[in-house]
């Protein structure tokens, strides 16, 4: 088990609305989630998530993509910003940049992402529309450790919902997002308690290799 003398620490990386960030903030405020978010970092100065962070009195940092057209320079600046806080975890919450392999390697086992599909199905973008067009019966979201291959890291937790006959991609996205707000904090709780660990490039639960993601 992890023995954090104080709350575990994290930085959260966002690009947009930050609703998953807000789910974290609400549970932290309610004393349910024992996590101290040290900073919220965005690559978009207009991200609404920055406003959410400021309202919660969390430090915000903006590293604008257009100022760093070179991916290596952007990742270096991002790494410097994260290292100022030395967090236990780095949560990607709608962070739309693909991180370079050497960046991911540096923080291996500490970076967590949430993705709007039942991975390994539908990595990448436009997951809801792709699921509908493929006549899937089920769709959902996944939390996973971030590795060098995009959306391919060890799965930790998933939640699935049925695709309804009248579902549009927008309707489906709203319903999936509600599940994201549940499983991302739940995953954080398991990480903080030490029940979930990253070892040998795999996810482990209570000392046992996690053969398949926890379904919630």
Predicted regions and their residues:
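Short, well-structured alpha-helical segments in soluble
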Residues: 76-85
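Donor/substrate-binding cores of folate-linked one-carbon enzymes
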Residues: 27, 89, 93-206
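Short, basic/aromatic-enriched C-terminal tail that caps enzymatic domains
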Residues: 22, 200-216
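N-terminal glycine-rich "phosphate-gripper" loop used for MgATP/nucleotide binding
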Residues: 42-43, 67, 71, 85-101
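Alpha-helical structural signal in soluble globular domains
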Residues: 26-31, 52, 56, 81, ...
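Short, surface-exposed acidic-centric catalytic microdomains
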Residues: 35-76
């Amino acid at each position: 088990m992890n023995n954090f003398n104080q709350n575990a620490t994290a930085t959260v990386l966002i690009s947009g609305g930050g609703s998953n960030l807000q789910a974290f903030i609400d549970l932290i405020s309610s004393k349910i989630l024992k996590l101290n978010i040290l900073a919220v970092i965005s690559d978009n100065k207009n991200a609404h998530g920055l406003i959410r962070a400021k309202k919660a009195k969390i430090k915000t940092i903006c590293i604008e993509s257009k100022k760093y057209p070179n991916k290596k320079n952007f990742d270096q600046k991002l790494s410097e910003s994260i290292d100022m806080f030395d967090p236990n975890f780095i949560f990607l919450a709608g962070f739309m940049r693909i991180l370079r392999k050497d960046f991911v390697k540096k923080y291996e086992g500490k970076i967590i992402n949430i993705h709007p599909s039942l991975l390994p199905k539908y990595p990448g973008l436009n997951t809801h529309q792709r699921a509908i067009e493929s006549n899937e019966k089920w769709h959902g979201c996944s939390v996973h450790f971030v590795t060098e291959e995009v959306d391919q890291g060890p799965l930790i937790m998933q939640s699935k919902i049925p695709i309804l006959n009248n579902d549009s991609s927008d309707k489906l996205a709203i319903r999936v997002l509600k599940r994201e707000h549940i499983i991302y904090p739940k995953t954080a709780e398991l990480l903080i308690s030490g029940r979930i660990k990253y070892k040998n490039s795999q996810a482990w639960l209570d000392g046992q290799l996690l053969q398949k993601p926890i379904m919630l």
